[in-house]
């Protein structure tokens, strides 16, 4: 049994590195019925960047008809603000 077909999106972001980023992003997606298809992330060492940047790419799907992209973006803006993300 596979996941329901739906719309697929890719979220890319960067922010100062600190604990809780992966948890916050994945929790947001779960709360919005998203299925994470792939996720990559890495932290840039502080010697390369003064604030130690964190980078993440998440490929996810939401069940059809799913939530409109604008609604997901509005909701995610709260997560982005909390971590000072560029996305």
Model-derived regions: residue spans:
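A conserved regulatory-domain signal marking ACT and ACT-like small-molecule sensing domains
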Residues: 1-87
């Amino acid at each position: 049994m596979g996941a329901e077909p739906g719309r697929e999106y890719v979220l890319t972001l960067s922010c100062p590195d600190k604990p809780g980023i992966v948890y916050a992003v994945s929790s947001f997606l779960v709360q919005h019925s998203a299925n994470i298809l792939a996720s990559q992330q890495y932290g840039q060492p502080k010697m390369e960047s003064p604030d130690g940047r964190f980078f993440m790419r998440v490929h996810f799907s939401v069940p059809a008809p799913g939530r409109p992209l604008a609604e997901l973006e509005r909701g995610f803006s709260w997560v982005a603000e909390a971590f000072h993300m560029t996305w």
